Amino acid sequence: MSTNYAYTHGASSIPLLGETIDENLKKTVEKYPDQEALICAHQNYRATYREFYEQVIQVAKGLIALGVKRGDRVGVWSPNCYQWTLLQYATAKIGAILVNINPAYRTSELIYVINQSGLSVMFSALQFKSSNYKKMMDDAREFTDTIRKTIFWDKSWDHFLKEGERISDETLRKREGKVQFDDPVNIQYTSGTTGNPKGVTLSHHNILNNAYFIGIRMNYSHVDRVCIPVPFYHCFGMVIGNLACTVHGATMVIPNDSFDPVKTLETIERERCTSLYGVPTMFIAELQEMEQKTYDLSSLRTGVMAGSLCPPEIMKKVKEQMNMHEITICYGMTETSPVSTQTKIGAPFEKQIYSVGTIHDHLEIKIIDPETKATLKRGESGELCTRGYSVMLKYWNSPDATHQVLDEQRWMHTGDLAMMDEEGYLHISGRIKDLIIRGGENISPKEIEDFLYTYKGVMDAQVIGVPSEKYGEEIMAWIKPKEGVTITEEEIRDFCKDRIAHYKIPKYWKFVSEFPMTISGKIRKVEMREIAARELGLEPED
């Protein structure tokens, strides 16, 4: 195909890794046994690669003792902690599938994920912020029937490890010997435009190789110490974070159970971190904190900004004020393990700031006309498609949803509007789908709309994203009350509280008697966004 077309592939002299996550981790342990593997500052936890792997083995044996078989789904519902990381590698070791559960989920969302994935074992924190996980698990039991055992981060965790002591090394070796690199290893639930979250199913091959090439692009080695304040339940934390470290022998440094700019900066200073991750809002908070207090960030070199569109002005400040001269921007999605393109160290400054980089090794991308599906020319805007080793296996137990995004040629249709320039750099300009991205969180309008319908006075509800300087987008709900019914913003907010995750509760509300409609009777969300932006004094979307 002519280079005039918006198509490119990541030709590479570096071969893909044809091994499981555990096989790869063993190599790192053998090479760097005394190198620090994991530091969890908020738990006063430290482990070298030798110590870390010994604990992974303990957890793996505990899972076998619980009766976890190859292919069984094991849930983890917790903020960042060392136990989460041990489970990530232990489930991979024995061929189980780790199911990441968003710590902000409430009972109804938890029930859906348990039933949809068929979880057999759940690991969970007891409580975090306003979430009482133990109570929600108790409330969920009558609506689920697949979970055999729930283990919390308390004495039951200690007992779980103790039970694993009766499993022999030989039993463990037999189990790990059956694991194949194309086996599913992880299910991550991500919101789309069609309602309930979908279970993105990823293999060892998917995420191990993506982590490998992310690290190569950032020049990672065993001397790097990577500060990971982003959540593990996202690919950002567990793949770009944890896996990219272990595949290159670097150190995972976890500053806190959730993001805190002060603790993050203090941890970088104390642990001499060389790399820092975050969504744009995290970097904005860190820059604001640095105006109040001086931190020694001289050890920083690189990092990743991703999760939502990265404002060029913020990128400039991070490079200049945080000493992150080699920071990279990543673009991707959970369905692609997650990174498809990434800026390169040493690329022209403008390309590092105003694009999302170039294609990763061994992957392909193209820009197509959303209607005709024809490949467009460079410089033209259309839908971005990705193909290659990184594309997910499927949406768990959702063949129809899978076929909607994965075509016969295995192209992943992202729903994102993008443009490829003459040099092959990718520029993201928006989305075809109505998906809202608030501070890096994917939020389905339909999921919130369906929930709002359950409120007694609501006749109709429509949810849109409106521009936000801080989060990229905020949620706005337009409510059409039933005839003769008056609904206040306060009462419907109270209804949402503790029933859906806090980040899904709309910030803006508008009560209407009608919605803007097309002649054929379809609701015009484009016009709704224009009206909202005008009334709220916000910039309308392009």
Model-derived regions: residue spans:
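N-lobe entry segment of adenylate-forming
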Residues: M1-A47, E51-L66, R70, D139-I147, ...
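Conserved AMP-binding/adenylate-forming core of the ANL superfamily
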Residues: L17, D34-Y89, R106-I111, D158-E165, ...
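Conserved pre-ATP/AMP-binding loop-to-beta segment of ANL
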Residues: P33-E36, K155-D158, E165-Y189, N196, ...
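Conserved AMP-binding A3 loop
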Residues: R46-R50, V185-N209
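Structural core segment of the AMP-binding/adenylate-forming
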Residues: K93-E163, E483
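AMP-binding/adenylate-forming catalytic core of the ANL superfamily
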Residues: Y105-N115, M122-L126, L276, G388, ...
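Conserved AMP-binding/adenylation subdomain of ANL enzymes
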Residues: L208-R225, C235-S275, E289
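Gly/Ser/Thr-rich phosphate-binding loop
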Residues: A250, R270-G278, L287-K351, E364
